[in-house]
């Protein structure tokens, strides 16, 4: 049985930890509101741009002269997995879920005989992916200096990715991030960003929504300008979603930790009181026994 001194030290330690987790929860809650508003504000623009891209692409014939970001390389052998995680931990299963989704896709592609490479945004996924896929990480973007995500941050990453794509380093790029649903729910999401995916359904829907629209100059010229921007916009959206998801997950994790600390303090306090009571009882018995001996 633990001594009274040891129990008292442990109770003090848990109370100190509880204060820290409670403070982190409050900070995450304050940041969550701002991050959530930014993520929700960015969705309509990204979705509308995607619809415009589909509308434009449905009006052109994809061929050798089409923009490479639309037509692709003509191959799908080398896949680059762009994994966006956080720079800091203590965010529950936020980073784990994103890495798990990327790992699942990587395993599936490798099983099909494809070559897989990783491009990391944030440092929290590096250790696991380096261990599971040694030598496959081609680059890591350091975001430790970023307090609030800006479009310029996403634009720099987009330029680097497009440059690598143009240089023939990969054929297809998949983006992994956590789509924010609520403080309790963040959905791991995979999105192909290079080449721009255009399904028959989205193309038809976009065509129907903008059937009366005429483009000047021609659609292919506009696509040449918009395709790189679309990559940056999708990256920016993912970063905003990640920022909100990270704070939501951290707030929930710290709330759980605070409540667990409270329960542990209660249990330790009960154990402390019982131990103290037992010690007092033992002393009384010894005093009474000594008195009777006299």
Swiss-Prot record:
GO terms for cellular component: plasma membrane; proton-transporting ATP synthase complex. InterPro entries: ATP_synth_F1_ATPase_gsu, ATP_synth_F1_gsu, ATP_synth_F1_gsu_CS. It is a peripheral membrane protein. It comes from the Bacteria. The keyword NADP does not apply. Belongs to the ATPase gamma chain family. Produces ATP from ADP in the presence of a proton gradient across the membrane. The gamma chain is believed to be important in regulating ATPase activity and the flow of protons through the CF(0) complex. This is ATP synthase gamma chain.
């Amino acid at each position: 049985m633990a001594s009274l001194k040891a129990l008292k030290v442990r109770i003090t330690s848990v109370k100190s930890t509880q204060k820290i987790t409670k403070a982190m929860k409050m900070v995450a809650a304050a940041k969550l509101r701002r991050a959530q508003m930014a993520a929700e504000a960015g969705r309509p623009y990204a979705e509308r741009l995607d619809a415009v891209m589909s509308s434009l692409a449905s009006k052109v014939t994809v061929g050798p002269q089409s923009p490479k970001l639309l037509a692709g390389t003509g191959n799908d052998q080398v896949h680059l997995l762009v994994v966006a995680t956080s720079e800091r931990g203590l965010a529950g299963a936020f980073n784990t879920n994103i890495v798990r989704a990327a790992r699942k896709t990587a395993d599936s592609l490798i099983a099909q005989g494809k070559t897989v490479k990783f491009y990391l945004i944030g440092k929290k996924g590096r250790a696991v992916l380096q261990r599971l896929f040694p030598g496959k990480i081609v680059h890591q973007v350091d975001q430790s200096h970023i307090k609030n995500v800006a479009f310029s941050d996403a634009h720099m990453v987009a330029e680097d990715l497009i440059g690598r794509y143009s240089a023939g380093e990969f054929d297809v790029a998949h983006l992994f991030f956590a789509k924010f649903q609520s403080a309790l729910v963040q959905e791991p999401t995979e999105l192909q960003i290079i080449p721009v995916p255009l399904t028959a359904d989205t193309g038809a829907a976009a065509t129907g929504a903008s059937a009366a629209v005429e483009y000047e100059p021609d659609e292919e010229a506009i696509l040449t300008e918009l395709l790189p921007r679309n990559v940056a916009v999708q990256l920016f959206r993912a970063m905003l979603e990640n920022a909100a998801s990270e704070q939501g997950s951290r707030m929930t994790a710290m709330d759980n930790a605070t409540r667990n600390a409270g329960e542990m303090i209660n249990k330790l306090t009960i154990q402390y009181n019982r131990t103290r009571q037992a010690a007092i009882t033992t002393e009384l018995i010894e005093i009474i026994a000594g008195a009777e001996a006299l």
